[in-house]
Structure formats: C-alpha cells, structure tokens
Amino acid sequence: MLAIPMTAAQAYNPTGGTVYQLGSEPCLKGRFNCAVYPKSAQLPSGRLVASFEKSTVVTATGSADRQTLPIHKSDDDGTTWQPLSEVKAPAYLSTDPRYAKYTSNWTNPFLYVLPERVGDLKAGTLLLASVVSGDDQYYKEHKSADPNWTPSNDGDRGDMAIALYSSTDDGVTWQVVNVVATGGWQGGSAGAVGQNIASANKYKQVDPLWEPYLMVHRGKLVCYYSDENDYIGFDPATGVPRLDPANDTAKDSHGQILVHKTWNGKSKKWSEPVVDIAGLTEDMGGGKTEIGGGRPGMTTIVPTADDKWLLTYEYWAGGANTRYRISDDPLKFFRGSPTGMGVDALPVVAGSRPLAAGGSPVLVRLPDGRLVYNAAGSGNVWVNDSGRTDGVWKEYQTTSRAGYSRNLQYVEGTGRIVILNNQGTSTIAHAEVDLGDSAGAYQQLVNRKTGQVIGTGNNSTDANIGNGDTPDVALEDAGAAADPDTQYWHVVTKSGGGVTLLNKSGGRAAAIWTGNATAGQRIGQWVDDSTTGTWTVVRSTNGHVKLQSVRNKDLYLTGASADAPLTLQNATTDGSQDWKLVR
C-alpha cells in the first residue's frame, strides 16, 4: 500500500497554449490561413519537434522568395514549445543547379523519424517532406500593380514540388536529400482553384502537389501525396497513372488524385507514382477523360491489428467528405474502389456519434495497437481499442477545439496525445489528452467506510457520451467491473496545484458533473479541462487521504454508502471521505 503515489506535473498541460501566433506582419495569402498545417514527430532523445506553414511576406525579398518552414521544439513532452530552427528552400541549402528553381519552402511539412536504416539514411534520422515552389507570381503581379493590394486567398506559385530534407542533430540543422515529385503551377489551389491565376501562367494550369505523408515499408521509404497533375487513367496491373500528354497546356480538370512513390535510400530518383485513390473519372470533352474527380486528398495510413492497412482521406464530390479504404497491401490501394466509403459507415459504440467529417482527417496507431482518429468537423477523437479494421470506435472529448489540419502525436514517456491545431486567425495551438493506459502507476481508491473502490460502471469515455449524459463515478466492489481498468486511476499532479484522478480505461477525469461545487453534486467522467476535476490531497489517519475540492474548500469527495454515487459533501468523520490508494 502506498500513501500518495502521484504522477509528476512537469509533462502534463491538458488545456495547452500557443505554439505560434501570427502578428501584424503582412501575409502572402489570406490572414485566416497564413499559419496552418502543423505536424510533429518525437525524436529518440524524447524531444518533440513541430513545423507548420508560415506564409508571411519575406522582408528581404518582399515576396515568397526565401520563405522558410519554422521548426519548434518541446523538451518537456509537449507542455511548452520554443523556436528551434528554420528550414530553407532547396535553392538556398544546396548548390545543385537542379534545385535552383525551388526558392520557397512553403507548406505541408511532414516530420518523420526513420525507425530503421533506409539506404544511406541511418535509423533515427529526422526527415522533413514539404511542398516547395518558386515565387508567388500572382502576389508579385498584384503588388506591382497596386502596392496597397492585400491578398485574401491562395495565389499562383510556379515549379511546385515535394522535397525531402534530413537532420541528424535533432532538427537544428538541415540538408536537402532530394526532390520526391514535381508538379507545375499552383493556379489558386486549393482556396481559389482556377481563379487566382498569374499572367505568367499562360495556359492557366493548376498542377500542384500537396500533403506528403512518410513511412517505411519493406525497407523502402514511401511518400504518399496529393497530385493535381492531369492523368487520363492508370495501368490496372501496376497502378501507375498515365499523364495527359498535354498536361502543361490543355484545359485543366481541377482534379486531384492520391498517389505514392517509393525510394530505396540510394538511387538518384524515386519510383514512378502509383495511384492510391483515383477519384471519379471526368469527361473533358473531345473524347478525353481524366481521373481525379472529387479531389481526394490528405492521405493518412496505418497498419491494423488484423494485418491490413487503413487509409483515410478527404473527398469533395458529394456524399461523405471524409472517407476510408482498407487494403491488404499499403502499396496496392489502386485495386479497390476509386472513391471509397464514408467514415460514417464505420461502427461505433452506443452513445458515440459517427466518426467526424469535414475533411483533413488524421489517423494514428498507438504502440499498444489502438487506432485514434480525428477530422476537421469535431474537436473530439475516436478510438478503436481493438485496432482492427472491423473494430468499433468510441468517441472521446478533448481540450482542443475543432479546426483544419489538426495533428495527433503519441508521446513516448507519457503515453498521452499532444494535439496541434490551427485556430482562429492563424494561431497554432497545442493541448494534451489522456486516452487511458498512459505512463505511470495506477491505483484503486478504497473507501474506508464501505471497503469499496471508485469505479465508473464499466464506462470508459466521458459520461455525456458513454453513460447517457448521466454522471457515472460511483462505489463498486473491487474486481466486480467487467472492464477492470475502470476501477484504476492515476493521481496526477497538476501544474497549477492539486491533483486529478484520471481513469485507466479512457483517461477521463473524475470531475464535478455540473461544474458547480456545491454540496450534493455528483461526480462524472469528463475530459480533464478545468478545475472541476482538481482536488487537494489532505492527509487523514492510518494511511488514508481526503480529496478536497479546489473549487470549494468546504467540500470533499464522498462515498456515502455501499454502491452509492460519488458526491461532494461537507466534511464528515464517518470514513466516507477517507481513501486509501492501493496498487
């Protein structure tokens, strides 16, 4: 038996803060999306690194020329963040003439730590894949014509491509590795597709590349990405798309497909692209058709516990705008449906809503096999405990509100998820969420009066989701729960003082249900987002403690009788407010 075994506060900040806030400096595009698309990775040292698009006007050039991607770091498990470095465009990091046209390191960073050696790249190397480009000619032309002009949306950059960088010193310095794939003109994509066209874009082309996603598979590095080049179809045997011979000059389809390339880490070039999601086939007239209708985009992909692969993406041709596909082989998604199924078709447990839609889906696999999903339409996440493609999903609240391009980062060392999010007017925010089974000791809290322990009636998620919007924390016989984890709790010290009880089954806090700290109020599971679930530990006798409400110091956590719901009550000496923590 332990008196008060607690988890340290240093690496826990559930409500989070700000990584970056746009100031008054001018932007190359609309201010609402001037800073967007945060992504992160964890290094072997434990450091977290993050990057995001920051499309402010480069002071030295007055344009997008010399734009960089910022790298920020956290050395305390995501609790605080500081600037670390800036990754320059290939033209300014390399003297190789092949990279001279790529003068802007623009957007869609994807950070990835190599889990094994790939060719000349050692295990543990930090990689960055990003969208690079030439200057924004639409911006330059409009500023030249009217110095007072202010952009309100995306512009038109030339020479768009996806570049690969590496760092061997935890993100401090960077080298260009190579160019993964090339596109053409941006053409206003994706906020003003085919509208914001520069005069220099003679044929009004819209052929950018977007959203790289890296992983290692069978000894090779794989880069998934979104491709707006114009393709007239693909080889059904190999999945290799057929580029329109008039891609650079013909009327643009404004379509997009999902593809991937592979690289062995030694060869000069990556493989040919292979289709993952082709989208609809569109009639371009004159007997020509092109794939890419519906603009599938933003690949995320994970292995599942039943030896399959689950891919999620956004889709804009009507019906479900956030979709998924399942494959036995992560390199052969082209063999299935060109449009996939809506994520709302995935099974959920009672009380949980269908998986969020709204585009920009994010999917991660935790070390224990659980799958975690989020999309732009909700601040909540959905967890598949089995990790199987036929597993059911359960909804959990988070402290990070809904937003475009959120990022979910599992943190080795805490077992929690750090969420990065674009909020409001180009604010990159961070928060943390506990989804259960996080690092540290769990204990049962035994009530002195009844001998029973604190449980949740087998509910593992927020009580408003999993218990019919009714508080669920109550006394139970030890070992009586069908899900044993629901009777175990972290006692976590908070940075502002006090402790929180976080349940092992889902990481939810034992909190005052109404938020009003008055006598008689019940206790229910809720995401750890306020002081309603924070307690002051007061030592009692014989190894017991009392848990005093931080919100109202006259009230204590109380189990009045056997099987009773937990409530807040004024101080009493009958043992109903005394608790012993037992492993």
Give the residues covered by each predicted segment.
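Short, glycine/acidic-rich beta->alpha junctions
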Residues: V206, G293
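Low-complexity, intrinsically disordered Gly/Pro/Thr-rich segments
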Residues: S405-R406, E412-N422, S561-Q569
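Beta-rich carbohydrate-recognition and catalytic domains
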Residues: Y12-V36, Q42-S104, V113-Y203, V216-E290, ...
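Repeated scaffold domains used in trafficking and secretory/extracellular systems
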Residues: P38, R295-T300, L355-V362, A402-Q409
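Secretory targeting and sorting signals
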Residues: M1-A11
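Hydrophobic, lipid-facing positions within transmembrane beta-strands of outer-membrane proteins
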Residues: V36, T107, M160, W210-P212, ...
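Lectin-like carbohydrate-binding module/patch detector with strong preference for beta-trefoil
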Residues: A439-R583
